[in-house]
Structures are given as C-alpha cells and as structure tokens.
Amino acid sequence: MMIIEGDISGQEAVKNVIYGTFLPVDDPYPVTPPIDHDNETVSLAFLISLSVTFALLMILLVATAAYVMFCGADEAEYDEETGEGSSSSVTGIHTFFGKKGGGILLDSTFCSPGQFDDEEALREQEEQELPKMSKFEIELYKRSREFQNLNPPLVKEFGTYLNTSDRQFIKDRGIQSYYFYPSINDNVDKYGNFLPSFLVQDKLDVTFTEYNKSSSTLLNYPLPFNKKEAVYFEVKIFKFPTNSNTIFSIGLVTCPYPYFRIPGMSRYSIAYESTGKLRINNPFGASTLLPRLQEGDVVGFGYRYKMGTVFITHNGKKMMDVTHNVGVDLFVGLGALNASYTRTYTKDGLLEDPDNVDIREALSQGREVELPDAIQKVYDPENLTPVAADEVELQVNLGQVGFVFIEANVKKYGFGSVLGEIGIPPAYNGDEIKRNAIIQKGEEMPPKYGFEEGDRNSFFGDIHIYEGHHQLEAEELPEGNGGVTTTQDAGARAATDYERVSSAFDRENNDTTKDPADEILHNQTAANTTKPNKTSNNNNKNHNNKKRNKRNKRRK
C-alpha cells in the first residue's frame, strides 16, 4: 500500500485506496475509471423474466381452476362397509369452493344414486334378506319405508334447517337449549295405560325401559356450527347389563326419522350399534367393524366442517373416518330394540352371522353355545305375556363437561357455551351487592321484639294474657283497699263481672231446658191472676145491693 504525502493523513489515504476514490496527485494525466452500466441492465432483464414467469403461472392456475370447476371429477368414493369403491362426478362451483351441495357422502351406501333408488336391486335384496327376518322385523321395515315415503327426509345444505329465532335462542341459552324428544304415546296396555318406551331425564339422559320394543329419539336441534374445526359429542353407556336382550345404537340421522326405528336402519342415517356393527342406511346384514359396547364405554361422534367428515371414537380413541363430503343437517339420534322379537339377534340369526367368531369356534369344537333365555328363540310381540327388555341408560355430553377424547377438549369441539350469552341469574346474596344502595336489604329477620313489661313501644305493644283491654281501665280506677289496686286484680274483677252478667242474660233468654207448651201455660196463668174477673165483680155487687135493700126495709 502506498502512503500519500501531503495534507492527507495516512489513515485517510488507506480509506481512499480501499474505497477506490483516491487519485494520485502527481499523475499529470489522471485517468478516470470507467463507469459500469451492466448492473442496471441485469436488473431490468431479471424483472422482465420474473414478470413473464408469474404471468405464465397465473395462466396455468386459471386453466387448472377452470378444468377442475367444469371438467374435473371428484375422487373415487369408498364404501366403509363393503370395501367397494365407485366414482361419481359432481360438477359445479360449489365443489371448487369446498361446499358439499352436490354430494352428500363419498360413502356409496348413504345417498348416492343407484343404491336405494334402484328398485330392481332393492327388490332382489329384499327377496334375499326378508325371509331371514322375523314377523316383527318385517313389519318395522315396511312401516319405515312407508313412513319415509310419506315424510321424505330433509336433505338440505348444512346450516339451513334453523330459522333466525332458533339461532338466537341457541345463542342465548347455549347447550341448555338442547334436549331429546319424549316417547311417543303408541305403547299402551289393555287398560289403556301409557307404557313409555324410554324416559328423558335432565334433557340429555335417556333410559330405555322394559316396555320398549323398538324406538328412537332425536335431539331437538341439528349439529351446530361452533366456529371451530369440528363439532363433537359423546355418549356414555351408564347402564347396560351383560348378555342383554336389548340392542341399542348411537348415531346421526336426518329429520324426520321413524320414531320406531333405531338409527342406521333407515335412509340417511349412520350409527354405531352395540353389537359392534357400523350401519349406514342398512336395514339388512351389516359388518362388524367396531368393538362391542359394554357398560362404562364412551362412544363419540364428530363432524368436520371443511371436508364434511364424520368420525367415530371409542373410549377417547379415534376409530375411523366413516364418511366424507357430508353437507346436510344431521341430528343426534339414540335408539334401542328388543332383540327377543327379532330373528337377527336371536340364536338362529347369530349362528348365521359370519362376524360371530366366538359362536363359530364353539360350534367347530363341539361345545354348546350358551345364550340368555331371552334370545334363545323368537318371541311374538302380540302375545299376552310380553318379554321385558333390559333397561339401558345413556348419558349424552354435548360439551357441558369434559370429553374423554382429548382433541375435542383442546380444540373445544363442544356444541357451544354451556350457559349461552345470557348466562345464569345473578347471585343476590353475594358480597358485590352489599355496596349497591338500590338493592340493599333491611334488617335480618326476625326483628328484635321488646319483651320488657310495660313497654308499649314494642312490636305488639304491652299485652298480657287473660287481661286484654281491661288493663287500661284498671289503671284509671281510683285507689282502694288501703290505696293498693293492682292491674291483675282489676282485670280479674272485670272478667268476673262480665261472666255474671252474661250468665244471667243466658238464663233469661237462652234457657233451652224449658218446654214450649209449659211456657205458654205459665204465661196464661200469670195473665189470669193479674187480670180482674168481671163475673165475680158483678156477683159481689148484686149481693151488696140485696143487703142494702134489707136494711132499708127494716128501718121503715
């Protein structure tokens, strides 16, 4: 490095050399370094190429979006029960923006055309399955078909069932606004007494009684939109005897749903059956894909809004995503069936079920199959002696308490606020109201009464028993008996005088011991004695006149 002499210091010279701004002062022909214009040229070319690239990408994205909207096909559907897949094309702008208006389920057994709408295929299935059923099951199946023909299920877009008033009520009351419908009055005895199929307690606790044959109940409102990723509920099996003759199911259904049919056996319903079967619109044989339920288990159902996915949990563990692309309003449904009246769940039907591995192993080993007496054979519900169903109690949790499924607790998948925006009534006995002058309360009850004798300013005044108002009169009497007259003596004397006067009056006017006839005779006798007798007076007068005449004659 060269150090420049002169006024410029060595440090400044080094800086000039480093930054390239120093020119030798001794050079007679200083040469200015050429100016490089390539930087601006490179920057302009880079910007042009970047703009072209973005334009091409935008054109590609627009073309892809147009293809997906108008020419694309949805992904293949998957049948969770049969394992078969089928593809269906649903076009429209709703699919592109994630709305499920076109398809209800990717599961082909839920609502895809050609499944239950194909009358020929349905007729063939009926010819194959109905002979395996009992008379009671066939009757339920036919009633269910007729019910849904007369009352078609409401298959509309999610969130369109409620009106403005219902939304406001749910917003105000929260989970407190939900409850299960009561039992229909269709089960009576020969005397006309109502025999309820189930009882609803505390709005969300359902108990299926011994009188139940086949029934179900729905929640009064569909699944809500809680502004989270999903909505979720759980059902705890609080009471369910071992080897019970009651079959129950928990699931989601559309409205209206046959009140005499358990969820999963009619159109547009999905349910987890207590036998472990997963039923999706399936009144016939279903596959056992889930664990058998027993007392103490907790079953959960969830619905993810974005993909329309329905998933199931068992004791806090996620089992499977059952269906996809569900875009309709679904209701929580509970149902129970008396298996004694069915062939499907009695001995013959259980032996024919390929999923009953334990029974088949027992038969292959030559062991006798042990079943409860209630499901050994098919009973007729029209018999005079009905078969009592085992009671089953189910408790539904919509988020009023913690979930067993951890994800639902962390992400708050409940139905909403427990108490709503209105909340609970204020506590009028709290410490915060003691500072409010408007709602200040009075003295503590009971009040302090004055019990001192002679205290007229007390609550009841100066009152003495058996004396009454004579006390004041006694105080005004003149002093006697040596100037000593007590209040008690005056009151006693006044009371005695009153008794005497009243007794005399009663004897004179209210004597009921006298005979009325004697009274009349007595009055007449008294009147005769007091009234003068005219006849006797005349006789006396004549007698006196005769004596006077005789005296006068003698004198003459």
Swiss-Prot record:
The chain crosses the membrane at residues 60-80. This is Protein SSH4. Residues 1-59 are cytoplasmic. Residues 81-556 are lumenal. GO terms for biological process: protein transport to vacuole involved in ubiquitin-dependent protein catabolic process via the multivesicular body sorting pathway. Glycans are attached at N163, N212, N338, N510, N523, N528, N533. Belongs to the SSH4 family. It comes from the Eukaryota. It is a single-pass type II membrane protein. The lineage of its organism: Eukaryota, Fungi, Dikarya, Ascomycota, Saccharomycotina. InterPro entries: B30.2/SPRY, B30.2/SPRY_sf, ConA-like_dom_sf, SPRY_dom, Ubq-SigPath_Reg. Residues 500-556 are annotated as: Disordered. Pfam families: SPRY. Components of the endosome-vacuole trafficking pathway that regulates nutrient transport. May be involved in processes which determine whether plasma membrane proteins are degraded or routed to the plasma membrane. Its main location: membrane. Residues 528-542 have a biased composition (Low complexity). The keyword Transcription regulation does not apply. GO terms for cellular component: endosome membrane; fungal-type vacuole; vacuolar membrane. GO terms for molecular function: ubiquitin-like ligase-substrate adaptor activity. Residues 127-323 form the B30.2/SPRY domain. Residues 543-556 have a biased composition (Basic residues). It is found in: Vacuole membrane; Endosome membrane. Residues 500-521 have a biased composition (Basic and acidic residues).
